[in-house]
């Protein structure tokens, strides 16, 4: 028999053999291919690979049908039968007994843990091939004691389609990689479990529990219907919280003022060392048994998001003088909670968080309390004054989680709240010149009660007749009452469009006209129900000649120069700087007189660089400073100084030769 031909034929048969799937799940392990020496050992009967019954049957079928290699088959079969028995292995069979299977070919093996190598396949030399005979001869071998359970067939052994598992210790890199994979798997499982629990809780919370009424009387059906309606109404209730100023509980109206701006929140002007009453109302679910109310004062930049700023501790600090003279505790707190039925605990930490917390009784839906501020905006540093101050309330559960909140967008602690509030309102509305009285109202026909003590005159000709004005009083009473009647000659603008200089000076060259006005002495700050006293007087529209008008302009120009010099000396200007304003002067000089140099950028944005530009701008816009956007607290100074400047310039233009 030709051995080379026989080997080649056997190789062809082995390559054409179908691969029988193994019973084990094998990962990508490192495998080694058998070389030519292993084939020679198999043919010579010196080496018998482990084969499954199916592989043996298929191999026997092909070998018996192939002429010339019966000797090879007999050699393999004889070697398989004479294989030494491994007595120390388990007697458990990995496959059930099949019909027609030879009992002497059944082998029992045990499964052992395998170390899987995830690396790429490595090619090994012929000398590194595994010799199973050497392993079987050494019974004390560790590899033999921990037998490899494998149902690898002959074709899988020779063709390299089945990876071989080896028992060895993991390297440090492999162990770290395996530990990392286990941690990632645990984290993924934990996240999946949390998502499932969250979805399950949402499903139970959103589930509508409906009552199915049983067959009963009409009264019981009504009870079930009422229960269903009650549960549906409870679910429709929305959770809300409001934080408002209780003006009715104020001791004085001048202590504070607040303005609710549409789409811009609440603005509050409050006086220092005065009680400001507040009320907080809310509606939350009944599942929260223990609630906490927190009041926090925050100082934040106008460019920041207020929703984020109120949740971050502010760096607001009370000034040193007020902190040293403070009697309440803690001394460094900017405000305190007084006149409240709840117990408030301050939380003033190292981060200067201005916060007070109250533990509420179960079932509480509103809280009344007063706040007293012990420092004001003018005490702060320049960097702190540029920020905005707001007051926020938070409703929290027993775990400190926020449920609802509300905020007063801007809080201003000032000396005169009503004055600053009016300036704020004037900035939003149409501004009027300060020299025009807002209380003077012209009436063409005055109808007064004749039975009244102060009855109006029946005609303009009888305005000076005091005997008709006070008919039912004595002589002394008439004299005393007549002293209260004032005849005022004021310049009132006509209905026609006036020129710009005339509107500034408050006069118009028209004919003399006589009319009456009635001025009410109303005290807006008083809550008295007394009837306001009316005063009747004379009102005139004056017509001036050219000479009189020149004197009039010169008088106001001189007065304007004196007022401008006062502004200059008040702001400590050097002698080199002139105490007057000229059209060629830069706008910075005008702002230095007012004391608001930081507003120069607003003027430059509108193209105003000199006083001449500002004069032309006023001829287009009456409310120029509101359009520019200056500080409302300094609005009166702006208009007053510009009025004096324009009167001086009008005198210069009027006296120039035509």
From Swiss-Prot:
SUPFAM superfamilies (UniProt xref): p53-like transcription factors (SSF49417)
Lineage of the organism: Eukaryota, Metazoa, Ecdysozoa, Nematoda, Chromadorea
Main location: nucleus
Function in brief: Transcriptional activator that binds the same DNA consensus sequence as p53. Has a role in normal development to ensure proper meiotic chromosome segregation. Promotes apoptosis under conditions of cellular and genotoxic stress in response to DNA damage, hypoxia, or starvation. However, not required for DNA repair in response to UV-C or to regulate cell-cycle progression. Regulates germline apoptosis in response to DNA damage. Required for induction of ced-13 in response to DNA damage. Its pro-apoptotic activity is inhibited when bound to ape-1 in vitro.
Residue ranges flagged as DNA-binding region: 238-428
Cofactor note (record): Binds 1 zinc ion per subunit.
Conditions for induction: By DNA damage.
Alphabetical list of Pfam families matching this protein: CEP1-DNA_bind, SAM_CEP-1_C
Gene Ontology CC: germ cell nucleus; nucleolus; nucleoplasm; nucleus; transcription repressor complex
Gene coding for it: cep-1
Chain segments carrying region Disordered: 450-477
PTM remark: Phosphorylated in response to IR-induced DNA damage which is thought to be mediated by akt-1.
Subunit-structure text: Homodimer. Interacts (via C-terminus domain) with prmt-5; not methylated by prmt-5. Interacts with cbp-1 (via HAT domain); cep-1 transcriptional activity may be inhibited by interaction with methylated cbp-1. Component of a complex that contains prmt-5 and cbp-1. Interacts with ape-1; the interaction inhibits pro-apoptotic activity of cep-1.
Annotated Low complexity bias: 466-476
Annotated keywords: Activator, Apoptosis, DNA-binding, Metal-binding, Nucleus, Transcription, Transcription regulation, Tumor suppressor, Zinc
Cofactor(s) listed in the protein's UniProt record: Zn(2+)
GO biological process per UniProt: determination of adult lifespan; intrinsic apoptotic signaling pathway in response to DNA damage by p53 class mediator; meiotic chromosome segregation; positive regulation of transcription by RNA polymerase II; regulation of DNA-templated transcription; response to hypoxia; response to oxidative stress; response to starvation
Protein's cellular compartments: Nucleus
Protein name (record): Transcription factor cep-1
Region Required for tertiary structure stability of the protein: start-end pairs: 535-564
Positions contributing to Zn(2+) binding: 319, 322, 375, 379
């Amino acid at each position: 028999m030709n051995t080379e031909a026989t080997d080649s034929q056997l190789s062809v048969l082995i390559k054409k053999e179908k691969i029988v799937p193994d019973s084990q799940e094998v990962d990508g392990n490192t495998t080694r291919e058998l070389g030519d020496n292993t084939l020679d050992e198999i043919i010579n009967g010196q080496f018998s690979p482990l084969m499954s019954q199916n592989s043996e049957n298929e191999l026997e079928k092909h070998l018996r049908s192939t002429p010339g290699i019966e000797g090879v088959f007999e050699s393999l079969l004889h070697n398989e039968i004479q294989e030494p028995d491994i007595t120390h292995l388990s007697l458990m069979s990995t496959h059930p007994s099949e019909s027609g299977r030879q009992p002497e070919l059944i082998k029992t093996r045990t499964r052992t843990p395998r170390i899987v190598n995830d690396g790429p396949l490595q090619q090994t030399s012929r000398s590194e091939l595994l010799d199973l005979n050497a392993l079987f001869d050494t019974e004390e071998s560790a590899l033999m004691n921990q037998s490899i359970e494998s149902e690898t067939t002959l074709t899988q052994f020779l063709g390299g389609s089945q990876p071989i598992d080896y028992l060895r210790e993991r390297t440090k890199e492999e162990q770290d990689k395996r530990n990392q994979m286990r941690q990632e798997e645990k984290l993924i499982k934990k996240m999946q479990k949390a998502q499932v629990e969250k979805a399950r809780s949402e499903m139970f919370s959103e589930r509508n529990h409906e009552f199915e009424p049983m067959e009963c009387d009409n009264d019981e059906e009504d009870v079930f219907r009422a229960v269903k309606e009650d549960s549906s109404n409870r679910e429709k209730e929305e959770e809300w919280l409001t934080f408002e100023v209780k003006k009715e509980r104020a001791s004085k109206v001048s202590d504070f003022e607040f303005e609710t701006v549409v789409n811009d929140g609440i603005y509050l002007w409050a006086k220092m060392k005065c009680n400001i009453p507040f009320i907080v109302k809310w509606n939350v679910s009944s599942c929260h048994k223990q609630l906490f109310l927190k009041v926090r004062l925050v100082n934040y930049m106008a460019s920041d998001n207020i929703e984020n700023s109120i949740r971050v501790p502010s760096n607001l600090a009370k000034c040193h003088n007020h902190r040293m003279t403070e009697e309440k505790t803690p001394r460094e707190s900017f405000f305190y909670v007084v006149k409240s039925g709840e117990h408030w605990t301050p939380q003033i930490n190292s981060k200067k968080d201005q916060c007070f917390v109250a533990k509420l009784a179960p079932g509480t839906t509103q809280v009344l309390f007063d706040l007293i501020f012990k420092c004001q905006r003018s005490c702060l540093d320049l960097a702190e004054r540029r920020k905005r101050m707001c007051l926020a309330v938070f409703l929290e559960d027993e775990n400190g989680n926020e449920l609802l909140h509300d905020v007063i967008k801007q809080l201003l602690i000032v000396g005169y709240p009503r004055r600053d509030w009016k300036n704020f309102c004037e900035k939003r509305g149409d501004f009027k010149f300060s020299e025009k009285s807002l209380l003077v109202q012209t009436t063409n026909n005055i109808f007064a009660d004749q039975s009244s003590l102060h009855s109006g005159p029946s005609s303009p000709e009888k305005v000076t007749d005091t005997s008709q004005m006070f008919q039912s009083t004595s002589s002394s009473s008439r004299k005393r009452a007549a002293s209260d009647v004032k005849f005022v000659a004021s310049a009132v603008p006509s209905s026609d469009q006036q020129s710009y200089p005339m509107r500034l000076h408050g006069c118009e060259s028209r004919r003399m006209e006589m009319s009456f006005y009635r001025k009410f002495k109303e005290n807006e700050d008083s809550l008295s129900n007394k009837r306001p006293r009316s005063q009747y007087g004379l009102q005139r529209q004056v017509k001036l000649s050219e000479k009189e008008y020149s004197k009039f302009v010169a008088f106001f120009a001189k007065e304007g120069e004196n007022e401008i010099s006062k502004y200059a000396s008040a702001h400590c200007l050097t002698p080199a700087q002139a105490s007057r304003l000229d059209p060629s002067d830069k706008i910075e000089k005008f702002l230095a007189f007012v004391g608001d140099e930081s507003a120069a950028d607003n003027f430059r944005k509108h193209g105003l660089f000199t006083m001449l530009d500002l004069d032309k701008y006023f001829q287009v816009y009456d409310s120029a400073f509101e359009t520019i956007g200056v500080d409302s607290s300094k609005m009166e100074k702006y208009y007053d100084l510009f009025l004096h400047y324009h009167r001086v310039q009008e005198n210069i233009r009027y006296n120039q030769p035509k």
